Amino acid sequence: MVKIGLYGASGKMAQSIISCLKDEKDATLSVAFSQKNEVENLSSELLTNDFAKFFEACDVIIDFSQKEATVALLNYARTNPKPLVIGTTGLNDDEKNLLHLASGTMPILYATNMSLGVAVLNRIARIASKVLREFDIEIVEQHHRHKKDAPSGTAMTLAGCVAEARDLNLKDVLVTGRAGMVGARSKDEIAVMALRGGDVVGRHTVGFYNDGEFIELNHTATSRATFSKGAIKAAIWLKDQSSGLYSIDDSLGLDD
């Protein structure tokens, strides 16, 4: 039985993970980290705001917190190694570099989306990008009104997949908004547009558009449990891995 430590226990994703762990046969929630004294659906015995106690009480940590909290977790873990599953989005280049640095002494799985469906979508989109080289690529993502980062980490990962498949540097071709007289679309341009509203859990569409035809690939998440179950399975897998930075593809056994 893998002992899971939940970091950022008061968040919506954390609440979903707590619920999913109740039905999990191979893992259990052993401790939860929060600055709050009370967290919904958690007994006070499981709660702590002390890093040392938190790390000691678990085999693997799952983190879906905010980026500042993730940085604090990584900095502590660098001298107290522990397998980490990190799903925090909106990380900048410096924060991603910290991930790489920390993975030198512990196994870290970082993914902007933990669902099997999105992992498959990324694979299919990569293939389509190679084959449909003359097609324009546009990505649209939609989330609930409370999501803080835009475009979503999932959409940016998807954009990275299709750019890499065409041997393009995403930073050189990325467009995240259009307004006014912007001129004609460039050949290599990859656009990522964000919609926000309601309680949409997550919807991502990557379109390949050409004269006379187009293809759109779509993934819709209808419940946060999709991501929670993926994170739990990733944590169970990560427990026995050596130091290094892993992706969700690694945990699913998807080959390049």
Swiss-Prot record:
GO cellular component: cytosol
Superkingdom in the source lineage: Bacteria
Key words of the record: Amino-acid biosynthesis, Cytoplasm, Diaminopimelate biosynthesis, Lysine biosynthesis, NAD, NADP, Oxidoreductase
Binding site for NAD(+): G8, A9, S10, G11, K12, M13, G87, T88, T89, A111, T112, N113, M114
GO molecular function terms noted in the UniProt entry: 4-hydroxy-tetrahydrodipicolinate reductase; NAD binding; NADP binding; oxidoreductase activity, acting on CH or CH2 groups, NAD or NADP as acceptor
Pfam families (UniProt xref): DapB_C, DapB_N
Family matches, as CDD domains: DHDPR_N
Catalytic activity: (S)-2,3,4,5-tetrahydrodipicolinate + NAD(+) + H2O = (2S,4S)-4-hydroxy-2,3,4,5-tetrahydrodipicolinate + NADH + H(+); (S)-2,3,4,5-tetrahydrodipicolinate + NADP(+) + H2O = (2S,4S)-4-hydroxy-2,3,4,5-tetrahydrodipicolinate + NADPH + H(+)
Keyword Zinc-finger annotated: no
Positions annotated to bind NADP(+): K36
Biological process annotations from GO: diaminopimelate biosynthetic process; lysine biosynthetic process via diaminopimelate
Binding site for (S)-2,3,4,5-tetrahydrodipicolinate: H144, G153, T154
Pathway this chain belongs to: Amino-acid biosynthesis; L-lysine biosynthesis via DAP pathway; (S)-tetrahydrodipicolinate from L-aspartate: step 4/4
Record-annotated active site: H143 (proton donor/acceptor), K147 (proton donor)
HAMAP family linked to this entry: DapB
Stated name of the protein: 4-hydroxy-tetrahydrodipicolinate reductase
Source species: Campylobacter concisus (strain 13826)
Gene: dapB
